[in-house]
Structures are given as structure tokens and as C-alpha cells.
Amino acid sequence: MIEEGAVADKAQAWVYTEDFIPLSNALLQAHQTASELGVPRVSTGTGTALRMLAAVSGARAVLEIGTGTGVSGLWLLDGMAAGGVLTTIDCESELLPHARRAFRGAGVPSHRTRLIAGWALDVLPRMATGGYDMIVLDGDIA
């Protein structure tokens, strides 16, 4: 049986960990845009995990399904190898300009990102087999 205090402590610990990691201005803006548009985004804890996974794997080519406003993409790009390319797919084409703005705001050169509008199940068959070091599923595929 879990004590009531333990649940409250866990909630407080989660808030602390989310607030502990400072966010760049670009990430703050992408978070704000996601909130304004009602678009889901990864938490700061999940973002740091994505950054770490991209870094330790030495990822140079990452495929992300679910672009949103660019929050997870910013974390991935921060962890990727220098010059690495993020290809990101989203079925909501109206979100892609927001992500593009977030990447530009973070100083990411445009040749390091490839944004594709469409359903992942339609787009994936056209992607290069074995062309990615890491694939992140963070959105709808169909």
C-alpha cells in the first residue's frame, strides 16, 4: 500500500526535476507555442533522455515521427553529432512552420533539418531503408 505522503512527495519530486534543467530560449518559445496551440510536447525529463540517447549513440541521422512545435526535435538536435540531420514527419502540416521557427531560433542551420508533412505510414515506405541511426515515435502514424 502506498502512503498518501509518498504520492505527494513523488509529485513534488517530478515538479523539481522538470524545473531543475534550464531551458534555452528556443525551447521555452517552442513550449509556449505548444501550450498556446494545445499541442502535446515531451516533458523536460523526456527531452533530456532523448538528448542523451542521441549523444551516446553518436546519431548523425535521426527520424522523428511527430514534429509538433519542435520541442523534441530541439532536444534531439542538441544531442546529435555535429552536422547530423533530423528528418521529422507530422500529419499536421500547419505545425511545421512553428517547428521550423523553433529550429531557426535555436541557430540550427536549415540543412540540418528536413520537415515532411504527411502521415508516417504514407511517408515511411519512401524513406531510405537503414538510413537512420535513431528513430523516435512521438506522434500519430496513421
Regions found by a protein language model. Name each.
Residues 1-22:
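N-terminal auxiliary segments of SAM/dcSAM-dependent transferases
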Residues 36, 40, 44-142:
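S-adenosylmethionine/decaboxylated-SAM
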